A protein has these predicted regions:
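Structured catalytic-domain cores with a bias toward divalent-metal coordination
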Residues: 1-173
Length: 173
């Protein structure tokens, strides 16, 4: 099921819309969210979301709970392959948790955070831009190390980085 989280009118009969794909099965009440597309020039996350949704739908009987996939938090940036939100000169990942009374982008960030509340786990997928290649990695804030490192070790990724840099970037998702 596709649900619209944010929908705002734009000039020339266009809409700024953020949607999520809800895949649910069984009676389980656990909820996992996967978000990507915060930066419009980081495209690998859309492929990951597609593959996860495909696998879940092909093996729905193995799912006992809910997975919510947000493939494009910055759809305007993705459409134009720009890191930030075009014409706003704004990095969306620096305005969380947003503001319900702020600009369009701040309102969108607020609605995203509100929609993610209550999730048991949120994966925020980032990648390099079109001109760089990085080693796959998991970044975990030191405050969540005890809970998240055991989960990260199950991802078959060689580089798990535990750091406290999120205290410097308090406005990131």
């Amino acid at each position: 099921m596709i649900k619209t989280i944010v929908s705002t009118a734009l000039p020339i009969n266009e809409r700024f819309a953020i949607r999520k794909n809800i895949i649910k099965n069984g009676k389980g009440n656990r909820r996992v969210c996967i978000v990507t597309g915060t930066h419009g020039d980081e495209l690998e996350g859309q492929m990951v979301c597609y593959l996860v949704a495909k696998q879940l739908n092909e093996h729905i009987d193995l799912l006992d709970g809910t997975v919510e996939i947000y493939p494009a938090l910055n759809p305007l940036g993705i459409d134009t392959i720009q890191r930030g939100i075009p014409n706003f000169d704004l990095d969306m990942n620096r305005i969380f948790p947003g503001n319900p009374n702020g600009t369009m982008a701040e309102q969108a960030a607020h609605l995203i955070v509100e929609d993610l509340k209550g999730a048991d786990l949120v994966f925020d997928i980032h990648s390099s831009n079109l001109y760089l290649r990085e080693t796959p990695q998991v970044r975990i804030n030191v405050l969540n190390e005890k809970e998240l490192v055991p989960l990260a070790q199950r991802l078959n990724i060689d580089f798990v980085w535990v750091h406290d840099a999120a205290t410097v970037l308090e406005s990131t998702l």
